[in-house]
Design a protein with these regions (language model features):
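N-terminal small-domain helix-loop-helix segment of the aminotransferase-like
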Residues: 7-99, 106, 281-282, 349, ...
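Conserved core of the PLP fold type I
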Residues: 60-197, 201, 207-225, 296, ...
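A non-catalytic, amphipathic alpha-helix used as a structural packing/dimerization or gating element
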Residues: 72, 256-259, 290-302, 380, ...
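Conserved core segment of the aminotransferase class I/II
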Residues: 224-294
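Conserved glycine-rich beta-strand-loop-beta hairpin in the small C-terminal domain of fold type I
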Residues: 277, 294-304, 316-329
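Conserved PLP-binding catalytic core of the aspartate aminotransferase-like
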Residues: 314-346
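PLP-dependent enzyme catalytic core of the Aspartate aminotransferase-like
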Residues: 345, 359-394
Length: 394
């Protein structure tokens, strides 16, 4: 009989990925995914960049490359991190990964032994939880409110908990809630982190997708001790199919991530990196991000307007200033998984929120995505969802 490693008991398929299989039919009004709008992918421009790379550097593009990543792309990433996040870095402090999801996997392997403690926001990104589970840690959820992680609660946990090896956060337009940390909390967080000297994984896939309000500084830009490991990605600002993300960290930490890259995949795709780099040199990434931002701004507005009109009391929802998601809290007696089945019968899909709490509970919550559906379908789908909620109120 085949015997598997004990860590496999910790792993299960992503509930979101499983749900996406059910919602693949074209007649489903799906708020379930976290995918960019495919109609915004710069297909023609990418074809030009691809042809240019193959004509000018074809053999290099099809060959193995360095573990760290294509040098020109790492320079471009460093330049953008300075321009957009006020993070002063250079290409030697950047490792290109196969999506930021690989950066999450490496983070677990670099820092965690079985039984170590990971602190994260409550709720938090399901993909990160699943990546960390392979290393068999204990999860402690830090309470949050509309301003992000509650710092007094973080202090209490750190003062009374042993073996805290890592803190994972999404300060900008968090997945799944859409919330953004305010400036005071960012400064307070870094003050606490500097005192306890615990590594922080700052996951920032949505930071450039701000629709309104002031840009907040990245935690990495406030880092004076080299404790913040910053994860970025091209998936939300260009195209996820290239599977290109990056890690920005100080020398000692980044060296460990390099070892993980060598062991896992040797490197990220050479041709994908070179085509992305060429596209950035040939075209205007800022203009492209503005196009994405404007599209999502309109879709978010339509979703929030429809929720405000149709969602019955005592239900509540978040009003994100950017990103891809809104978060709904139902009455405590209502189970979002039961609601999900009733909505699927009406051809409407969403993600039940309990999946985003690693220690369980909170089954009266759900996540809604607005990036991938035209405005008129958002109105129809949200109206049907709210109608179904109303039918199940006590």
């Amino acid at each position: 009989m085949v015997q598997f490693a004990s860590r496999m008991e910790q792993l299960k398929g992503s509930e979101i990925r499983e749900l996406l299989k059910l919602t693949a039919q074209p007649d489903i009004l799906s708020f379930a995914g976290g995918m960019p709008a495919p109609e915004l992918f710069p297909v023609e421009q990418m074809m030009e960049a691809s042809i240019a790379v193959l004509k000018e550097h074809g053999r290099e593009a099809l060959q193995y490359s360095t573990t760290e990543g294509f040098p020109r792309l790492r320079e471009q990433i460093a330049e953008r991190m300075l321009a957009k996040n006020n993070i002063h870095t250079d290409k030697d402090h950047i490792l290109v990964t196969s999506g930021s999801q690989q950066g999450l996997d490496f983070s677990a392997r670099v820092f965690l032994n079985p039984g170590d403690v990971v602190l994260l926001e409550s709720p938090s990104y399901l993909g990160a939880v699943n990546a960390f589970k392979a290393c068999e840690p204990k999860f402690i959820e830090v309470p949050t409110d509309d301003g992000g992680m509650i710092m007094d609660e973080l202090e209490k946990i750190l003062a009374t908990t042993e073996r805290v090896k890592m803190i994972y956060v999404i300060p900008d337009f968090q997945n799944p809630t859409g919330r953004t940390w305010d400036l005071d909390r960012r400064h307070k967080f870094m003050e606490i982190i500097n005192r306890y000297e615990i590594p922080v994984i700052e996951d920032n896939p949505y930071g450039e997708l701000r629709f309104e309000g002031e840009y907040m500084p990245a935690l990495k830009s406030l880092d004076t001790k080299g404790l913040v490991i910053y994860l970025g990605t091209f998936s939300k600002i260009l195209a996820p199919g290239y599977r290109l993300g990056w890690v920005c960290a100080e020398d000692e930490i980044l060296a460990k991530y390099n070892f993980m890259e060598q062991a896992a995949s040797l490197q990220a795709s050479t041709i994908g990196q070179m085509e992305t780099s060429k596209w950035i040199d040939m075209f205007d990434l800022d203009a492209h991000v503005n196009t994405i931002r404007e599209c999502y701004r309109k879709r978010r507005a339509v979703m929030l307007e429809t929720l405000a009109k149709e969602l019955p009391e005592p239900c509540t929802f978040t009003r994100p200033d950017g990103g891809l998601f809104a978060w709904v809290v139902l009455p405590e007696y209502m189970d979002a998984k039961d609601l999900q089945m009733k909505c699927l019968a009406k051809k409407v899909a969403f993600v039940p929120g309990g999946s985003f709490f690693p220690n369980g509970g909170h089954d009266n919550t759900l996540r809604l995505n607005y990036s991938c559906m035209p405005e008129e379908k958002i109105v129809k789908g949200i109206t049907l969802l709210c109608q179904t909620i109303r039918e199940n109120l006590r």
